[in-house]
């Protein structure tokens, strides 16, 4: 992420103002493929959704995504989920939202927006186009 992002983010100058826009497409899964160790945390994180302390649980377990030294204060980000888990029923999306929000806020993202998986592709495409044109 950092390798490509840092060189492509435009910075405001005295004569030009920029708003960078990033669209991130994620599969919506919490664990990496074939990584059984990752799934041990899922029950704890699901419980944290019910209690309402997902961010605290992520921090307590030391699961925060490491911050990279990139200033996103002039950047708006849209994160799109493309694959809802049948077993999660929205839970994985909420946990991913907590992870990504925490991480991007620590890099001062100007605006963070999430798009839950849509059944119709054209709805997703329209939402992405609206985000870019804003």
How does the language model describe each region?
Residues 28-32, 83-86:
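Solvent-exposed loop/turn segments at secondary-structure junctions
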Residues 50-134:
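Von Willebrand factor type A / integrin I
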Residues 32-34, 39-50:
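Scaffold/interface architecture of coatomer-like assemblies
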Residues 1-21, 26-31:
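Von Willebrand factor
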